[in-house]
Amino acid sequence: MHSTDQNQPLAPSVPATPAPAPSTTHSLRNEIRVWTRDLLIAIGLALVIIVFLYQPVKVEGTSMAPLLSDQERIFINKFVYRFEPIHRRDVVVFWYPLDHSKSFIKRVIGLPGESVEIRQGIVYVNGRAIDEPYVPTQYEDMSDYGPLRVPNDMYFVMGDHRISSNDSRVFGPVASKFIYGRAVFAYWPVDHFGSLSTTEASSTDSK
């Protein structure tokens, strides 16, 4: 018969091996994947907005200097006037009333029903001189014009470079149906990069 020595020391117990922690590399990879997906979605949505809401145009001429220069590239908002009215000082793009194959870009000066008059280069709307900080002194035209009553659903537009602008002083007010966008952002050249909010490739003539 075999006996067991009660005094024999027991073998030491081995602690259980803890479960491995989640891989840090795997977690980081998932985060990068999610971040990349969200970035691509954001870029895609931005492109959709630009394509459907905005239109790139090229400015030709200097009549909107110094705000816009010849060959400058800008975006116009094509749908803004479906949701809000045209405002004074808006820089708008429209089909040239005398040749609908051409587009012009000018600033809105007179609204429907208003009286527009120019005396020694100062523009009066309904008998009151309007403030025009966007027209530098060297670009002022001291000629007289009007008075003229702007017909309903039409707008009196002028270039900021008054001396070289072919605008409503020449071809008269522009019908709202010919106005198809508002200038909102300049993107080229890079030193002009920024908003064109009041202080939207086709070719836009600003002569």
Feature annotation, model-predicted:
Residues 43-45:
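Single-pass alpha-helical transmembrane signal-anchor segments in small membrane proteins across taxa
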Residues 2-37, 48, 52-58, 63-207:
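Soluble "head" domains of membrane/secretory-pathway proteins
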